[in-house]
Amino acid sequence: NSRIQSIDLLRGLVMIIMALDHVRDYFHADSFLFDPLDLGKTNGAIYFTRWIMHFCAPVFMFLAGTSAAFMARRKTKKELAWFLFTRGIWLIFLELVVVNFGWNFDVLFTNIYFVTIWALGVSMIVLALLIFLPIPLVLVIGFAIIGAHNLFDNFHVQGNTLPAFGWALLHDQAFFDWKGHNVLVGYPLLPWIGIIALG
């Protein structure tokens, strides 16, 4: 067995916490009316189940990078790059087709969400390129992205345009209306690429 049990256990724990948050969303209808982290409106249980979620996506993304580093010990760079690329494409497909359908069971895909699984997929594709660089350089790139991406927080591309959508994919959470489809970019790529690179 080539799997590393501690990584699988941590992934499993993160998945349980994510499931807890999604269950909270379905059974606590008011969570759609106010921020569960608003101390003036929440309670301890609601606050905690939302707060702990902030660790899930970063841990999952970091572990994806860590797993790739362990795979590099038994695969050639070309094999690993192909694995990361194809896995990334598969995750993007799952997010945009299967998961998006599962949210609303809408065959017209009126609502399209670019969220966690999509960001993981694209980050894996970028990592497929980064693995060809020296490891210290990948580390520097990861730290630079994480440390500097907030410098762009005050830069926004306005409107319902392709440039605005492109910038949202990179850095800005945003909603778009595209030919009768509501598009949400919930997980911009830049910070996640930094985290997977550090992993």
List the predicted regions and their residue ranges.
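Alpha-helical transmembrane segments and their immediate juxtamembrane cytosolic regions
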Residues: 1-199
